[in-house]
């Protein structure tokens, strides 16, 4: 996932690929998360932690509690053998014993692109000075010295805040302020599996030695910083989406990954600390919700009124590649900005190709230089990829080298070329990345070109008897069209866990994003990169997620009474799916119009989300009904919800009737498929009429009633959508459409995805 934007650090290379069970260094033990039925604690215990410890002692003399959980789940984590875990499962009050899982990270112009600028206070008057809304970020920590955490102009820390600032290696509590009001770190689960943290390589504290966490938290809620840029690129004023909101960081990711026991502990603390929004740019694979630590923790946060925003993943453009698909999570894909960093690949045959680059340094001589394909400068089978140790110095010295994208980090390829004596690099996309161009702060003159240009350049360099080339770096341009387009790396639907829930929910800027950076690493994150920068430009759904987190904080400041579902609804139903000329958003991976499986409800539009007209709200009871519709057992529901809940055998539960702002219809034969929704007026009195669009004539979409008349604010109205299928299509076929309600002032849109199973 993160390999789609790996330009920064070796950290990403060490992360587990996918949602994987963590293997211990010991063949006997692993970390387990134990869910307990809190209400079943025997009266002989005065504290739940004592009960947990006693239960553990009954099956092991040596096992110790790593964490006890009170908010995210009821239970604890510990190290056990498989036999001990099986034995613990038989103890009274134990609901489940789940193995630790490891997650991966999904990793100035943006506010203007989204319509947020110095006039933001006109749209969000309650957030114009400073806000008491707190954005919690689970990531790699924070670089507190960054200007993005300046508390100038901020009032006192909110009285509702219950969090703290933890000291540790290279970090003191005094580094927090009225902006950065909380900082914690969680490493017990990580260290129990990976061993003690090597403090010569990373700080055992909230300090961010990687950069990812500083980038995401400042994207969500960084203070206004004038004169921001990366090496002169993207210069301007940097600001987070909610620059007057408070920030609390929870460091859960380390060099070896992000572990579910630590993530749950961080969510547990964040709930107790009273954050309002949780931003998590991490994930991995797909798993049933009762086995997914992020989904379980997010459910508890949702119950406390905390919106949870998560990255969709960087495994696109493959279908069904999403992470974080629980319906109580806002799942965010990535799109581009209207800003680019062009750099020309100039060939000796007179042809030029535009790529992208963030290189800053001594330019190449103003002449054509010898040019070689990496595959012809190596004896290794993967020499074309410019991996460490594969290039023959005698063949590349003094030359520009063409490398193919894949396997190792883009910037690492340039480092390999430079180490072998090459003077420049042309990096070519392959079919996996198509025409998507992600800019990097290379260590030598370099440009990245798309697949089509790469094919032409490769043919030239491998067939011309004396190929030559040069590279010209052109700086920053804005106003690029079309924009946005869906990023190729952005993970796609359909949702393989619950196909009747359309995911991702929406997209936000996630390509070439400028935000604050750590002072402990260069912009590439490579050990050979001695440069230090205050801001960096990187890409991934890791970057799009905090955009939505920050926008949710803005909406929370304006509408403090709104639930997480209401805030998500406002963001989704006001998202746009077309450009200003009416043409549909494009998918860079195909060059064709994107679909709801690519962009969800569309691209976020904060200027309209403040007044959506109608919202689709959801309660905890609705989500419990959803779990019943999945045929979850009572213990499985309890693992997710921390409560003893029994589905009503006399009630018919349907995933299709979850009050979600989108429609995913799975067709299994001809017939009628009915979906019910309830909308709440937040725009006052008004009469809304429905408009239905559909790509296919094989499915008739009808809405009853077709008109909703609201007499006052907060009034609720229900409607039923019937999808009548009168023709079959091959399994795997998809068709798309939309359902829109409008009163002439508001347009409340919902995407429709129809899939034949």
Swiss-Prot record:
Transmembrane segments: none annotated. Its EC number is 3.4.21.-. One of its GO terms (molecular function) is serine-type endopeptidase activity. Optimum temperature is 80 degrees Celsius. Thermostable. Residues 196-219 are annotated as: Disordered. Residues 1-24 form the signal peptide. Keywords: Calcium, Cell wall, Glycoprotein, Hydrolase, Protease, Secreted, Serine protease, Signal, Zymogen. Optimum pH is 5.0. It comes from the Eukaryota. Residues 25-106 form a propeptide. The active site is at residues 139, 212, 542. Glycans are attached at residues 170, 352, 376, 379, 631, 644. The keyword Hydrolase applies. Disruption phenotype: No visible phenotype under normal growth conditions, but mutant seeds are defective in mucilage extrusion. GO terms for biological process: mucilage extrusion from seed coat; mucilage metabolic process involved in seed coat development; proteolysis; seed coat development. GO terms for cellular component: apoplast; extracellular region; secretory vesicle. Induction: By methyl jasmonate. Expressed in immature siliques and at lower levels in stems and flowers. Widely expressed at low levels. It is found in: Secreted, Cell wall. Residues 198-213 have a biased composition (Basic and acidic residues). Residues 31-106 form the Inhibitor I9 domain. Belongs to the peptidase S8 family. Serine protease. Has a substrate preference for the hydrophobic residues Phe and Ala and the basic residue Asp in the P1 position, and for Asp, Leu or Ala in the P1' position. Essential for mucilage release from seed coats. Triggers the accumulation and/or activation of cell wall modifying enzymes necessary either for the loosening of the outer primary cell wall, or to facilitate swelling of the mucilage. This is Subtilisin-like protease SBT1.7. It comes from Arabidopsis thaliana.
